[in-house]
Amino acid sequence: MSKNFFDYLKLSTINKIEPVAEELSVSKVARGPGGFLEVYRSVRGRPDSMKNQWYTERHNWNKRREGFIKRHLAQIQKQDEPIWDENGHPTRRHLALMMWAYSPDPEGVLSWLDEMKK
């Protein structure tokens, strides 16, 4: 398996997070028809398969995802934004990144999901 520049969150993890994004109206396009999640689900959450799924003739979904993540991480860094709010919940931008199967804090995501179960 080739290494992706930005590690993918597991599809099972994203499936648990998606209802929160939906409730907050985050990442409607990524979650919608023809969006990132539909494609990620179509390859059964296999990151290596995303490079074989084409967004345009010249760009695959893996590259599109990397571009999205780079833009949002740059904004987080530039604006010194936290990715978790004062209550320990992901910010809207962090949720958006998760809907593209990425988090700069994957262990924190798992801990947050565990807390939500309680």
Where are these regions (language model features)?
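Arg/Lys-rich, low-complexity, intrinsically disordered basic segments
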Residues: 1-118
